[in-house]
Amino acid sequence: MKKKLEHIELDVAFTVSDEIIVLFGPSGSGKTTILNCIAGLAKPDTGKIQLHDVILVEDKQTFLPIQQRKIGYLFQDYALFPHMTVWKNISYGMKSKAFAEQLMKELGIDHLRDRYPNEISGGEKQRTAITRAIATEPKLLLLDEPFSALDEQARARSHEELLRLHRLWNIPIILVTHSQQEAEKLGDRILYLHDGKLQRDQPVK
């Protein structure tokens, strides 16, 4: 996949199985742009992105709409609707509510269902956002620095929850982080990026 950005030209190629892949590198190395291209929020200039047997993007011929990609995306700022309760944030647009109910119990936020985002803590917002991302039953989960705003205790809890959810649902996850320690704790593989290029693809022992 290639995409020309303001200061760099992004040029990367990698595959993901049912594992946690970490995109690691300095600011401006193209990490978030990669997630946005996979999610359909940005278009690569050339290249191919495929999820299982479904082609999401292929050069100029194919560009699958966001809503058809079956991808969950957790943004750095969580992007919760401030005027909606926790339950409405999670269940918005869903036909079946049973899975969302199950997830809320799994992540320990069922007691927050009638509260609004401004009434809950940063860790609770993070768990609400990740519940919303998984509630759509995605085939791939994208996480853009989801733990950066949390304190040390909340971050440690969120790490354990993510690993538990991955073991439970076994879907591929691509995680962006600036923390080497976080990358090594959570990742099965770390992709080191610099100036839009993949420098190293390193398994975590």
Where are these regions (language model features)?
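Catalytic Walker B motif of ABC-type/P-loop ATPase nucleotide-binding domains
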Residues: 141-145
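Conserved H-loop
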Residues: 170-176
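Helical segment within the ABC ATPase nucleotide-binding domain
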Residues: 156-169
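Conserved ABC ATPase signature
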Residues: 116-120, 124-126
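ABC ATPase NBD coupling module
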Residues: 56-73
